[in-house]
Amino acid sequence: MISTTSLFAPVDQDLRLLTDNLKRLVGARHPILGAAAEHLFEAGGKRVRPAIVLLVSRATLLDQELTARHRRLAEITEMIHTASLVHDDVVDEADLRRNVPTVNSLFDNRVAVLAGDFLFAQSSWYLANLDNLEVVKLLSEVIRDFAEGEILQSINRFDTDTDLETYLEKSYFKTASLIANSAKAAGVLSDAPRDVCDHLYEYGKHLGLAFQIVDDILDFTSPTEVLGKPAGSDLISGNITAPALFAMEKYPLLGKLIEREFAQAGDLEQALELVEQGDGIRRSRELAANQAQLARQHLSVLEMSAPRESLLELVDYVLGRLH
């Protein structure tokens, strides 16, 4: 499987600069929040989201050099993403992310919530200073979508009436919205034609949905040391994802186990078995592959270039995480 190092080669130097700048942008006026943010930016993330912004920027600028605003947009994107992870971990009461202790487990929930708020506030400040109203609207929508996604997930816990449409809507809010809107924003900053910007949005949306579906499959199939959290943790917390939704169609018993919140001994083990036996994993793979194919199609509007090639290969990378 291709590594992110070779995948992001066209923006390698840009990403190095971004990592250095992120720590500086967060600032040290609040030592505890600064320490929390420092911990986050050192937590081994692959910087996929800012890399997409940088690749789209270079693919739409072609021979022109990246502007300071394109670089700042990539930094804002990573700040927003990181803030959402911090709040996610508080809501999910998670102790590990990428096999690294979460901010809430390292400090406490109060500091974690404030650290997330701080990053959202910082990103909003830098966003406003881009002086581009359309980009401000696109990224502000992402912050709203994060909250809406968390609310949707919370109110639908252990709800077996959840359908595929609701699942995809929640996945868009929590994952795809940031990738879609930031990709479009990069096109806007490059003064790309309107239809190109719209295709960039669609690329990001379908790539983001594929990414989330793959994540949800891995939650069932990957051991803790690979995933950085216990296998089946989504199901345990009542978050019903694509593999469980598909398996419930074949095995209604799975729905009953979920509704009683795995209260009896052996319930969870049986539920995980039913997901595997009920074609939940196979059908979810097909769903992810379909979203990936849609993402590929929307890149045809870009001229051939190394950054465009990386954006195409990124689609294969997302699906390749399953192997």
Curated annotation (Swiss-Prot):
UniProt entry keywords in alphabetical sequence: Isoprene biosynthesis, Magnesium, Metal-binding, Photosynthesis, Transferase
Any Pfam family the entry gives: polyprenyl_synt
EC id: 2.5.1.-
Residues annotated to bind Mg(2+) 2: 88, 92
UniProt cross-references to NCBIfam families, sorted A to Z: prenyl_cyano
Family: Belongs to the FPP/GGPP synthase family.
Protein name per UniProt: Prenyl transferase
Organism: Synechocystis sp. (strain ATCC 27184 / PCC 6803 / Kazusa)
Gene that encodes the chain: preA
